[in-house]
Protein backbone atom coordinates (compact mmCIF):
# COMPACT_ATOMS: atom_id res chain seq x y z
CA UNK A 1 0.00 0.00 0.00
CA UNK A 2 1.34 3.43 -0.97
CA UNK A 3 2.00 5.63 2.06
CA UNK A 4 1.39 9.32 1.38
CA UNK A 5 3.62 10.76 4.08
CA UNK A 6 2.67 14.44 3.77
CA UNK A 7 -0.99 13.55 4.12
CA UNK A 8 -0.27 11.38 7.16
CA UNK A 9 1.79 14.15 8.78
CA UNK A 10 -1.14 16.56 8.34
CA UNK A 11 -3.47 13.94 9.76
CA UNK A 12 -1.17 13.39 12.72
CA UNK A 13 -1.11 17.11 13.50
CA UNK A 14 -4.89 17.13 13.45
CA UNK A 15 -4.96 14.15 15.84
CA UNK A 16 -2.55 15.98 18.13
CA UNK A 17 -4.68 19.11 18.09
CA UNK A 18 -8.13 17.50 18.36
CA UNK A 19 -7.66 14.12 20.06
CA UNK A 20 -4.54 14.38 22.21
CA UNK A 21 -4.05 17.97 23.38
CA UNK A 22 -7.59 18.34 24.87
CA UNK A 23 -6.83 15.41 27.20
CA UNK A 24 -3.49 16.66 28.55
CA UNK A 25 -5.19 18.62 31.34
CA UNK A 26 -8.22 17.56 33.39
CA UNK A 27 -10.00 20.65 34.77
CA UNK A 28 -10.67 20.33 38.51
CA UNK A 29 -11.94 23.81 39.39
CA UNK A 30 -12.21 27.33 38.04
CA UNK A 31 -10.74 30.51 39.49
CA UNK A 32 -12.19 33.91 40.27
CA UNK A 33 -10.49 36.63 38.24
CA UNK A 34 -10.50 40.38 38.80
CA UNK A 35 -8.70 42.86 36.58
CA UNK A 36 -7.55 46.45 36.37
CA UNK A 37 -6.52 47.93 33.01
CA UNK A 38 -3.71 50.39 32.37
CA UNK A 39 -3.82 51.59 28.73
CA UNK A 40 -0.54 53.52 29.06
CA UNK A 41 3.00 52.80 30.18
CA UNK A 42 3.36 49.94 32.68
CA UNK A 43 4.03 50.31 36.39
CA UNK A 44 6.91 48.38 37.93
CA UNK A 45 5.59 45.03 39.20
CA UNK A 46 6.88 45.43 42.77
CA UNK A 47 5.11 48.78 43.18
CA UNK A 48 1.83 47.50 41.75
CA UNK A 49 1.75 44.32 43.81
CA UNK A 50 2.52 46.28 46.99
CA UNK A 51 -0.50 48.49 46.31
CA UNK A 52 -2.68 45.52 45.37
CA UNK A 53 -1.86 43.52 48.50
CA UNK A 54 -2.58 46.53 50.71
CA UNK A 55 -6.04 46.93 49.14
CA UNK A 56 -5.31 50.09 47.14
CA UNK A 57 -6.28 48.56 43.76
CA UNK A 58 -9.91 48.20 42.69
CA UNK A 59 -10.08 44.96 40.69
CA UNK A 60 -13.19 44.46 38.55
CA UNK A 61 -14.60 41.11 37.34
CA UNK A 62 -13.11 40.08 34.00
CA UNK A 63 -15.79 39.32 31.41
CA UNK A 64 -15.51 36.06 29.47
CA UNK A 65 -15.51 36.56 25.70
CA UNK A 66 -14.39 40.19 25.83
CA UNK A 67 -10.97 41.77 25.09
CA UNK A 68 -9.10 42.12 28.36
CA UNK A 69 -6.88 45.06 27.40
CA UNK A 70 -5.82 47.63 24.82
CA UNK A 71 -2.86 47.71 22.41
CA UNK A 72 0.51 48.04 24.20
CA UNK A 73 -1.39 48.37 27.47
CA UNK A 74 -1.07 46.29 30.63
CA UNK A 75 -3.86 44.52 32.48
CA UNK A 76 -3.19 43.19 35.96
CA UNK A 77 -5.28 40.19 37.03
CA UNK A 78 -5.90 38.97 40.55
CA UNK A 79 -6.51 35.21 40.35
CA UNK A 80 -8.09 33.55 43.40
CA UNK A 81 -8.50 29.80 43.63
CA UNK A 82 -9.02 26.87 45.98
CA UNK A 83 -7.52 23.43 45.49
CA UNK A 84 -10.03 20.56 45.78
CA UNK A 85 -9.78 18.61 49.03
CA UNK A 86 -8.90 15.43 47.11
CA UNK A 87 -6.35 15.62 44.30
CA UNK A 88 -5.51 12.94 41.71
CA UNK A 89 -2.61 10.90 43.07
CA UNK A 90 0.72 11.18 41.29
CA UNK A 91 -0.32 14.00 38.99
CA UNK A 92 0.99 17.57 38.92
CA UNK A 93 -1.64 20.25 39.56
CA UNK A 94 -1.29 23.36 37.41
CA UNK A 95 -3.00 26.65 36.75
CA UNK A 96 -3.90 26.71 33.04
CA UNK A 97 -4.56 30.02 31.31
CA UNK A 98 -6.57 30.75 28.16
CA UNK A 99 -6.21 34.47 27.56
CA UNK A 100 -7.41 34.32 23.96
CA UNK A 101 -4.33 32.92 22.24
CA UNK A 102 -4.45 33.23 18.44
CA UNK A 103 -2.74 31.24 15.68
CA UNK A 104 0.26 33.38 14.82
CA UNK A 105 3.91 33.70 15.87
CA UNK A 106 4.50 33.86 19.60
CA UNK A 107 6.79 36.92 19.60
CA UNK A 108 4.10 39.35 18.44
CA UNK A 109 1.38 38.21 20.78
CA UNK A 110 -0.12 38.64 24.22
CA UNK A 111 2.18 37.54 27.04
CA UNK A 112 2.00 37.55 30.82
CA UNK A 113 3.99 37.02 34.00
CA UNK A 114 2.64 35.35 37.14
CA UNK A 115 3.71 36.61 40.59
CA UNK A 116 3.19 35.61 44.19
CA UNK A 117 1.81 38.14 46.66
CA UNK A 118 5.34 38.79 47.97
CA UNK A 119 6.36 40.01 44.49
CA UNK A 120 8.44 36.99 43.51
CA UNK A 121 8.10 35.60 40.00
CA UNK A 122 6.49 32.20 39.40
CA UNK A 123 6.83 31.97 35.61
CA UNK A 124 5.76 33.55 32.33
CA UNK A 125 2.83 32.69 30.07
CA UNK A 126 2.41 32.76 26.30
CA UNK A 127 0.45 30.81 23.65
CA UNK A 128 2.75 27.77 23.72
CA UNK A 129 3.47 27.81 27.45
CA UNK A 130 0.27 28.75 29.24
CA UNK A 131 0.52 26.99 32.59
CA UNK A 132 2.11 27.53 36.01
CA UNK A 133 2.76 25.01 38.80
CA UNK A 134 0.65 24.68 41.94
CA UNK A 135 1.48 21.17 43.22
CA UNK A 136 4.19 18.84 41.91
CA UNK A 137 3.46 15.21 40.97
CA UNK A 138 4.99 14.08 44.28
CA UNK A 139 2.69 16.39 46.27
CA UNK A 140 4.96 19.38 46.97
CA UNK A 141 2.99 22.64 46.89
CA UNK A 142 4.37 25.85 45.43
CA UNK A 143 4.63 28.44 48.18
CA UNK A 144 1.87 30.47 46.51
CA UNK A 145 -0.54 27.83 47.90
CA UNK A 146 -1.67 28.38 51.49
CA UNK A 147 -1.97 25.49 54.00
CA UNK A 148 -5.75 25.39 53.42
CA UNK A 149 -5.27 25.04 49.65
CA UNK A 150 -6.26 28.60 48.78
CA UNK A 151 -4.05 30.84 46.67
CA UNK A 152 -3.84 34.28 45.10
CA UNK A 153 -1.74 34.91 41.99
CA UNK A 154 -1.10 38.32 40.43
CA UNK A 155 -0.72 38.24 36.65
CA UNK A 156 0.80 41.09 34.63
CA UNK A 157 -0.78 40.75 31.17
CA UNK A 158 0.81 42.52 28.18
CA UNK A 159 -1.80 43.23 25.48
CA UNK A 160 0.62 43.25 22.56
CA UNK A 161 -0.81 43.53 19.03
CA UNK A 162 0.47 41.50 16.10
CA UNK A 163 2.68 43.92 14.15
CA UNK A 164 3.48 42.50 10.69
CA UNK A 165 7.11 42.58 9.57
CA UNK A 166 8.38 45.04 6.97
CA UNK A 167 5.07 46.83 6.36
CA UNK A 168 3.62 50.23 7.24
CA UNK A 169 1.69 50.09 10.51
CA UNK A 170 -0.19 52.45 12.81
CA UNK A 171 0.80 50.37 15.84
CA UNK A 172 4.44 51.38 16.18
CA UNK A 173 4.38 54.66 18.09
CA UNK A 174 2.46 54.49 21.37
CA UNK A 175 -0.43 52.76 23.16
CA UNK A 176 -3.65 53.23 21.18
CA UNK A 177 -6.15 52.97 24.03
CA UNK A 178 -8.22 50.39 22.13
CA UNK A 179 -8.17 46.66 21.44
CA UNK A 180 -6.78 46.58 17.89
CA UNK A 181 -6.62 42.79 18.22
CA UNK A 182 -9.43 40.86 19.94
CA UNK A 183 -7.73 38.75 22.56
CA UNK A 184 -10.83 37.47 24.34
CA UNK A 185 -10.51 36.22 27.91
CA UNK A 186 -11.67 32.62 28.23
CA UNK A 187 -10.62 30.91 31.46
CA UNK A 188 -8.09 30.31 34.21
CA UNK A 189 -8.52 26.77 35.56
CA UNK A 190 -7.00 24.50 38.18
CA UNK A 191 -6.13 21.33 36.27
CA UNK A 192 -4.40 17.97 36.71
CA UNK A 193 -1.64 17.22 34.21
CA UNK A 194 -1.67 13.81 32.50
CA UNK A 195 2.07 13.39 32.00
CA UNK A 196 1.69 10.28 29.82
CA UNK A 197 -0.70 12.11 27.51
CA UNK A 198 1.67 15.07 27.28
CA UNK A 199 4.58 12.73 26.57
CA UNK A 200 2.59 11.13 23.73
CA UNK A 201 1.90 14.58 22.28
CA UNK A 202 5.63 15.35 22.53
CA UNK A 203 6.52 12.05 20.80
CA UNK A 204 4.22 12.88 17.89
CA UNK A 205 5.62 16.40 17.73
CA UNK A 206 9.16 15.02 17.40
CA UNK A 207 8.13 12.48 14.75
CA UNK A 208 6.20 14.96 12.59
CA UNK A 209 8.98 17.53 12.88
CA UNK A 210 11.56 14.92 11.87
CA UNK A 211 9.56 13.79 8.85
CA UNK A 212 9.20 17.37 7.66
CA UNK A 213 12.99 17.77 7.65
CA UNK A 214 14.26 14.34 6.55
CA UNK A 215 15.15 13.19 3.05
CA UNK A 216 12.68 10.63 1.71
CA UNK A 217 15.62 8.66 0.31
CA UNK A 218 16.54 7.73 3.89
CA UNK A 219 15.02 4.36 4.92
CA UNK A 220 14.46 5.78 8.40
CA UNK A 221 12.04 8.33 6.90
CA UNK A 222 9.66 5.56 5.85
CA UNK A 223 10.02 3.64 9.11
CA UNK A 224 9.13 6.79 11.07
CA UNK A 225 6.17 7.50 8.82
CA UNK A 226 4.78 3.97 9.12
CA UNK A 227 5.22 3.94 12.91
CA UNK A 228 3.46 7.31 13.16
CA UNK A 229 0.55 6.07 11.07
CA UNK A 230 0.27 2.89 13.15
CA UNK A 231 0.38 4.88 16.39
CA UNK A 232 -2.41 7.32 15.56
CA UNK A 233 -4.51 4.45 14.21
CA UNK A 234 -4.20 2.72 17.59
CA UNK A 235 -5.06 5.78 19.71
CA UNK A 236 -8.77 5.95 20.59
CA UNK A 237 -9.59 8.92 22.79
CA UNK A 238 -12.66 7.06 24.12
CA UNK A 239 -10.47 4.22 25.43
CA UNK A 240 -7.60 5.43 27.62
CA UNK A 241 -6.02 1.97 27.58
CA UNK A 242 -5.06 2.52 23.92
CA UNK A 243 -2.61 5.26 24.95
CA UNK A 244 0.02 2.72 26.01
CA UNK A 245 -0.40 0.83 22.72
CA UNK A 246 -0.10 4.03 20.69
CA UNK A 247 3.11 5.02 22.48
CA UNK A 248 4.55 1.50 22.17
CA UNK A 249 4.13 1.71 18.38
CA UNK A 250 6.69 4.54 18.41
CA UNK A 251 9.18 2.96 20.82
CA UNK A 252 11.49 1.27 18.34
CA UNK A 253 11.80 4.16 15.87
CA UNK A 254 12.17 6.70 18.69
CA UNK A 255 15.05 4.79 20.29
CA UNK A 256 16.98 3.71 17.21
CA UNK A 257 20.41 5.39 17.16
CA UNK A 258 21.62 7.43 14.22
CA UNK A 259 23.88 5.84 11.62
CA UNK A 260 27.57 5.48 12.45
CA UNK A 261 28.67 8.47 10.36
CA UNK A 262 26.10 10.90 11.81
CA UNK A 263 27.34 13.95 13.70
CA UNK A 264 26.82 14.24 17.45
CA UNK A 265 25.03 17.46 18.36
CA UNK A 266 24.63 19.02 21.79
CA UNK A 267 21.53 21.18 22.09
CA UNK A 268 21.42 24.27 24.28
CA UNK A 269 18.57 26.62 25.07
CA UNK A 270 19.15 30.11 23.67
CA UNK A 271 16.87 33.14 23.60
CA UNK A 272 16.94 35.30 20.50
CA UNK A 273 15.33 38.44 21.93
CA UNK A 274 15.21 41.40 19.55
CA UNK A 275 16.03 44.52 21.56
CA UNK A 276 14.13 46.84 19.21
CA UNK A 277 11.98 45.11 16.66
CA UNK A 278 8.16 44.86 16.54
CA UNK A 279 7.46 46.21 20.02
CA UNK A 280 8.55 49.10 22.30
CA UNK A 281 11.93 48.82 24.01
CA UNK A 282 10.23 48.74 27.39
CA UNK A 283 8.43 45.61 26.16
CA UNK A 284 11.80 44.03 25.40
CA UNK A 285 12.73 44.64 29.03
CA UNK A 286 9.64 42.71 30.13
CA UNK A 287 10.21 39.96 27.53
CA UNK A 288 13.66 39.33 29.00
CA UNK A 289 12.15 38.69 32.42
CA UNK A 290 9.49 36.39 31.01
CA UNK A 291 12.01 34.42 28.97
CA UNK A 292 14.43 33.92 31.85
CA UNK A 293 11.66 32.95 34.28
CA UNK A 294 10.59 30.14 31.96
CA UNK A 295 14.19 29.01 31.47
CA UNK A 296 14.55 28.82 35.26
CA UNK A 297 11.30 26.83 35.46
CA UNK A 298 12.77 24.32 32.99
CA UNK A 299 15.95 24.11 35.07
CA UNK A 300 13.83 23.26 38.12
CA UNK A 301 12.38 20.32 36.16
CA UNK A 302 15.62 19.23 34.46
CA UNK A 303 18.92 20.17 36.16
CA UNK A 304 20.82 19.19 32.99
CA UNK A 305 19.11 21.92 30.97
CA UNK A 306 21.58 24.62 29.88
CA UNK A 307 20.45 28.11 28.87
CA UNK A 308 22.36 30.90 27.13
CA UNK A 309 21.49 34.58 26.78
CA UNK A 310 24.14 36.50 24.89
CA UNK A 311 23.26 40.22 25.21
CA UNK A 312 24.78 42.03 28.20
CA UNK A 313 22.05 44.68 28.04
CA UNK A 314 19.42 42.00 28.58
CA UNK A 315 21.13 40.93 31.80
CA UNK A 316 21.20 44.56 32.93
CA UNK A 317 17.46 44.92 32.32
CA UNK A 318 16.84 41.64 34.11
CA UNK A 319 18.74 42.73 37.21
CA UNK A 320 16.95 46.08 37.22
CA UNK A 321 13.43 44.64 36.98
CA UNK A 322 13.89 41.21 38.60
CA UNK A 323 16.89 41.15 40.95
CA UNK A 324 15.51 38.12 42.80
CA UNK A 325 16.15 35.48 40.07
CA UNK A 326 19.57 36.98 39.29
CA UNK A 327 20.76 36.80 42.89
CA UNK A 328 19.25 33.49 43.97
CA UNK A 329 19.83 31.21 41.01
What would you call each of these model-derived segments?
Residues 1-329:
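Carbohydrate-active enzymes and regulators
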Amino acid sequence: MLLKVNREVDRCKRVMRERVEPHIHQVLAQCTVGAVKNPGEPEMPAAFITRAVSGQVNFQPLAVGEPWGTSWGTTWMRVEGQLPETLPEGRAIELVFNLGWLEWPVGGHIEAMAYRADGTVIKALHPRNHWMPLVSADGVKDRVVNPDGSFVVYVEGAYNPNVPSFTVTELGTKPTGKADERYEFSSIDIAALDQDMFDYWADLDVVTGSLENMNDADPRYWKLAKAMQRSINLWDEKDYNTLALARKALDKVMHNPANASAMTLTAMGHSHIDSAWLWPVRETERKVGRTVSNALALMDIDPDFTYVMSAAQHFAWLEERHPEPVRTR
